[in-house]
Amino acid sequence: MGGGVSVELPKRDPPPGVPTDEMLLNVDKMHDVIAPAKLLEYVHIGPLAKDKEDKVKKRYPEFRLVNTGPGGLSALLRQSYNGTAPNCCHTFNRTHYWKKDGKISDKYEEGAVLESCWPDVHDTGKCDVNLFDWCQGDTFDRNICHQWIGSAFNRSDRTVEGQQSLINLYNKMQTLCSKDASVPICESFLHHLRAHNTEDSKEMIDYILRQQSANFKQKYMRCSYPTRDKLEESLKYAEPRECWDPECSNANVNFLLTRNYNNLGLCNIVRCNTSVNNLQMDKTSSLRLSCGLSNSDRFSTVPVNRAKVVQHNIKHSFDLKLHLISLLSLLVIWILIVAI
């Protein structure tokens, strides 16, 4: 029976471990990565020491800390959105913010806590109650309120909750604006109702405007409620009254009944005229108005004096020599007689 042969191999130390991408993550440098996470989305944050867990949980209260592997590998799972309506609804650009000592900031600073806004918070109607009150106050931003009212007519939220919020908003706006349509939020509402351009929106416009007080109609709706003399005068013209009545051409179109608004659209513009009824601007906006002129000297804005034009043409025309013309005429006649 033969004996086996054993060979002793040289011993070598194993190669050092190569860290994975997850092991190289540092939760303290991931503020902008963690904050945008969607509901039930995991965000891997790398190895996390036990003594740092409480600090991370306090910084991200909307997330649940979960273990994902050996060596303290961890991840955060989004479970909620804790942003408040005043901080999320009064702007269309904010997705999250950091709160510290009662103050908020868009950038992280040590000791701050993350609060996130619900995705598409304006589209879902979650801001309706807050903005309805805020836009009637003294500190509202007119551009934000105008944009919010406009977005209400184009919401994609078809859930029962979203549709009910929209119905409630329309009802509250109709009640508020029927009392006084000059409130800024009501003027925006009427503007977007007009732009919506449906039979229902037209009926709501007319209903709201007809409910206005006598003082309101006298101040803002003289086109829609003309005097008897103005009505009698309108019988003399074939074109709609809205085309020549200054009370219509100078009126705020948001306060025109649908009939008057439509008639105004039938008018032909025969002069250069600009009328701005709704203008939303901020500190970065600029405005330029032009009537198609490249410079102020291209056309004269002074009324034409026809008599002066005729005199100018005569003065600069060629000088007629009547005696010379007479002699030439006689010469031509003589030549014709001789030739015959």
Swiss-Prot record:
<keyword id="KW-0519">Myristate</keyword>
<keyword id="KW-1160">Virus entry into host cell</keyword>
<dbReference type="GO" id="GO:0019031">
    <property type="term" value="C:viral envelope"/>
</dbReference>
<dbReference type="InterPro" id="IPR004251">
    <property type="entry name" value="Pox_virus_G9/A16"/>
</dbReference>
<keyword id="KW-0735">Signal-anchor</keyword>
<dbReference type="Pfam" id="PF03003">
    <property type="entry name" value="Pox_G9-A16"/>
</dbReference>
<feature type="topological domain" description="Virion surface">
    <location>
        <begin position="2"/>
        <end position="319"/>
    </location>
</feature>
<keyword id="KW-0472">Membrane</keyword>
<feature type="transmembrane region" description="Helical; Signal-anchor for type II membrane protein">
    <location>
        <begin position="320"/>
        <end position="340"/>
    </location>
</feature>
<keyword id="KW-0812">Transmembrane</keyword>
<keyword id="KW-1168">Fusion of virus membrane with host membrane</keyword>
<feature type="lipid moiety-binding region" description="N-myristoyl glycine; by host">
    <location>
        <position position="2"/>
    </location>
</feature>
<keyword id="KW-0426">Late protein</keyword>
<comment type="subunit">
    <text>Interacts with OPG143. Component of the entry fusion complex (EFC) composed of OPG053, OPG076, OPG086, OPG094, OPG095, OPG099, OPG107, OPG143, OPG104, OPG147 and OPG155. Except for OPG095 and OPG053, each of the EFC proteins is required for assembly or stability of the complex.</text>
</comment>
<dbReference type="GO" id="GO:0019064">
    <property type="term" value="P:fusion of virus membrane with host plasma membrane"/>
</dbReference>
<dbReference type="GO" id="GO:0046718">
    <property type="term" value="P:symbiont entry into host cell"/>
</dbReference>
<dbReference type="GO" id="GO:0016020">
    <property type="term" value="C:membrane"/>
</dbReference>
<keyword id="KW-1133">Transmembrane helix</keyword>
<dbReference type="GO" id="GO:0055036">
    <property type="term" value="C:virion membrane"/>
</dbReference>
<keyword id="KW-1169">Fusion of virus membrane with host cell membrane</keyword>
<comment type="similarity">
    <text>Belongs to the orthopoxvirus OPG086 family.</text>
</comment>
<keyword id="KW-1162">Viral penetration into host cytoplasm</keyword>
<feature type="region of interest" description="Disordered">
    <location>
        <begin position="1"/>
        <end position="20"/>
    </location>
</feature>
<protein>
    <recommendedName>
        <fullName>Entry-fusion complex protein OPG094</fullName>
    </recommendedName>
</protein>
<keyword id="KW-0261">Viral envelope protein</keyword>
<keyword id="KW-0449">Lipoprotein</keyword>
<comment type="function">
    <text>Component of the entry fusion complex (EFC), which consists of 11 proteins. During cell infection, this complex mediates entry of the virion core into the host cytoplasm by a two-step mechanism consisting of lipid mixing of the viral and cellular membranes and subsequent pore formation.</text>
</comment>
<keyword id="KW-0946">Virion</keyword>
